A protein has these predicted regions:
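Internal helix-loop-helix
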Residues: 1-29, 33-39, 79-86
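A short, Trp-centered hydrophobic/proline-enriched beta-strand micro-motif
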Residues: 38-46
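Cysteine-centered functional microenvironments
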Residues: 45-49, 72
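Short Gly/Pro-enriched turn/cap motifs at secondary-structure boundaries
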Residues: 50-53, 77-80, 100-102, 127-134
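A structural signal for short hydrophobic beta-strand segments in well-ordered beta-sheet cores
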Residues: 60-63
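A short core secondary-structure module
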Residues: 72-121
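Glycine-rich beta->alpha junctions and the first turn(s) of the following alpha-helix
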Residues: 119-192
């Protein structure tokens, strides 16, 4: 079923894979066993209202506060959000000047847990298809996460996100092809 494919693809390629590929040994030990066993479900938060996946349009920010990162902002259209336990989230951590002296935003990736203070899942989307898959917004209101939950290198979150999406596209393309083949087979059987 299409829904199962989307849930599993988002879970494995968009949440577990970036932890496997970029996580510290401690992050891998904490998250991968529960994600791989299915005890925990994962999601990936990049898309924002008014910005989509444009790195320079990102409004979700993460500021250092002692031993914590404090996240503020929101994400939309997040697959698995209604039921996920772990989220990979992209947020702006640095505003710098590029080589030409223009202001630019550097994003970083973070591991957010459903129970983190200041984090909540917003409204569910009323979708036309793949309705069994939960798609919701993520809300960060002074969401405090320990500093050791940064995933990968500071300021390289956009690169991490793009590499992650490359892997996710394979799963979604495979699903689309399978659904199209199934629809064609059913159509041929019907018209005979």
């Amino acid at each position: 079923c299409g829904t199962t494919g989307v849930i599993v693809s988002a879970h494995t390629s968009l949440c577990a894979a970036p932890i496997y590929e970029n996580g510290t040994p401690e992050q891998k030990a904490k998250y991968l066993p529960k994600l791989c066993s299915g005890e925990w479900l994962g999601a990936f938060g990049l898309t924002e209202p008014g910005a989509g996946t444009d790195a320079q349009g990102q409004q979700t920010i993460a500021k250092e506060d002692g031993d914590y990162w404090v996240l503020n902002g929101s994400k939309i259209f997040i697959t698995n959000a209604g039921f996920a336990d772990v989220f990979i989230v992209i947020a702006v951590t640095d505003n710098v000047l590029d080589k030409r002296g223009r202001p630019t935003k550097l994003c970083s990736a973070f591991i957010v847990e459903r129970t983190d203070p200041g984090f909540s899942v917003g409204k569910a989307e009323d979708k036309m298809g793949i309705r069994g898959s939960s798609t919701c917004e993520l809300i960060f209101e002074d969401c405090r996460i320990p500093k050791d939950r940064m995933l990968g290198v500071r300021g390289k979150g956009f690169q991490l996100a793009m590499a992650t999406l490359d892997g996710g596209r394979i799963g979604i393309a495979s699903q689309a092809l399978g659904i199209a083949e199934g629809a064609l087979e059913e159509t041929i059987a019907y018209v005979k």
